[in-house]
Amino acid sequence: MRPKLATLAAAACLALNLFVVPATPAHAFGQLNLPALGEAESDQLSIDDERKLGDQIMREIRPDPAVIDDPVLYQYLMSVFVPLHEAALRRGNISPEQEEKLAWEPFLVRDPEFNAFALPGGFMGVNLGMIAAAGSRDEMASVLGHELSHITQRHIARSMVVNKHQSMITMAAMLIGLLMSVKARNGDVPMAVITSGQAAMATGQLTFSRQMEAEADAFGQDVMTDAGFAPSGMAAMFGRLEDASRLNDSNQYPWLRSHPLTIERIAAARLRARQGAPQDPAKSHITEHALMRARARALMDTSDVALRRMQAQARLNVPLNDAERLGTLYGGALASIELRDFAPAAAMIAEAETVQAQHAALVEQQAREATAPVVSAHEATGAPIVVVTPRVYAIEPEVARDFALLRVEEAVGRRSGPEISAAVATLGDDRSRPALMARAEAAIGRAAARDPSAGASLQMAVESLQTWVAEHPRDVLAWTLLAQCAEPLGQKLRAIRAEAEAHAAQGDLLGAIDRLRAGQKLTRSGRLDFVEASIIDSRLRELQAERRALGRDLHDADHP
């Protein structure tokens, strides 16, 4: 029988408890049980077992406050990830079994370090620091494409084949290091874990072989090119990281510790970039990326010092192009909202609207004028001089949407009913997830402000969220907002059920079962909503069965 991963993880915990920081109790990591992973004759971790392992890791990670669901940033992340995933499918990099059984789910981590990491089961962690540091959407796609290729090429499972016993210890140490990194957010702790476990890991990442790194580079760059991103993004990112690591050795780049840059990797990326076709600048989302970099910076470090620095930068009258200026204003406004300094936030949003209007006028003027180059004569020789005016590209429509959403955040922060209503109106008929969540937050804000229209807004939010969760039952934030909107309407049973579903979506089955039992108790008191009551009974049975099945898996893991 091959050693079970749970046993090795428990042994690793005992060996590693010396390195746990005081703020994080040792027992918090000693309780990590992992599913059984099959027999010794298996050549590698099966896809089913890989998904089980990934699900168990995510059950430990999701409840941590460092894992955030910011609808605006997450939608931007998915706007890069989804084309990469689709391109990998088209190229045949993802087998039908992988596509069906793996999660293909990225998640955001509130951490200023430049890092992204692939996990078993098709999960991918993305630090806000990576988004903030990426100079373009293409550079961001290069990192995600690289990590996606670690998943599609099954590098974790293949690494375990090389030396089964040692790789299991490595994986156990990896999981402990990952959990300690996310929960303690102390870079020294996971490195101590890595050393003691003899795992080539950094903040939750496997250090893959040079061959696998080269493979992930090549597959990742091909995938990002097929997805419509500029292949030069990977070479540009490598150059940016090379310069940064040379000038700054402050451990802010853990991705480099587990993905060491070599001359060969950089040269290969540059060669592939030269062979690819240049991207149309109109499709590069330059301004939207500037806004999302600023949002990542504001959310990854919410200290007063960091936020006031962003606020001050937005007030500086320095020459910037429109994309940079809009990014700076967006970051300054968001920082002001976080500081509850609403007057500067409103002023910065208004200035951004002026910049957008002026830019649109310039684009329109350019379109009206002849596209032919201006020809003039040289003063001395009379020879013709061709003057080509640089083309000005229209700002992406997503930018106006992002500022409209920011205006809603600012109005909700003020808790002014009329201002909230005016801000929500700027969203128009936007049915995206960020707009849906913003309307729900606005309805809750109206209720807090005792706005007379709050009841109608809450009911509309409940109906919209109920439709959304029917199609997206794993959306924790949507369930949470549904509970918060239903409660003030007196829909107690619906609110309790939504709270339970939020717990279940996070993997907290005990918490979900507890809330559903509270719902059953409420129905026995005579406050009946027969539809919700029947759903609660059914879901309670389902989750109890799921918990029993999970318990059997963990029992098998502990008793090989």
Which ranges hold each PLM region?
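Active-site His/Glu-centered metal-binding helix of metallohydrolases
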Residues: I57, L144-I156, F219
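Short pre-active-site segment immediately N-terminal to the catalytic Zn-binding motif
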Residues: F114, G125-S142, L206-Q211
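Extracytoplasmic and endomembrane cell-envelope/extracellular-matrix remodeling and assembly machinery
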Residues: E39-A40, D55, V67, Q75, ...
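Acidic/histidine metal-binding catalytic segments
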Residues: M160-A172, V189-A192, G228-F238
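Catalytic Zn2+-binding segment of zinc metalloproteases
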Residues: G135-E139, L148-H165, K183
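Hydrophobic or amphipathic, alpha-helical segments that drive membrane association/targeting
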Residues: R2-T7, A12, N17-L18, P22-F117, ...
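Envelope-exposed proteins and targeting segments
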Residues: L73, E100-W104, P112, P120-M124, ...
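Membrane-active amphipathic alpha-helices enriched in small hydrophobic residues
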Residues: M168-K183, A192-A200
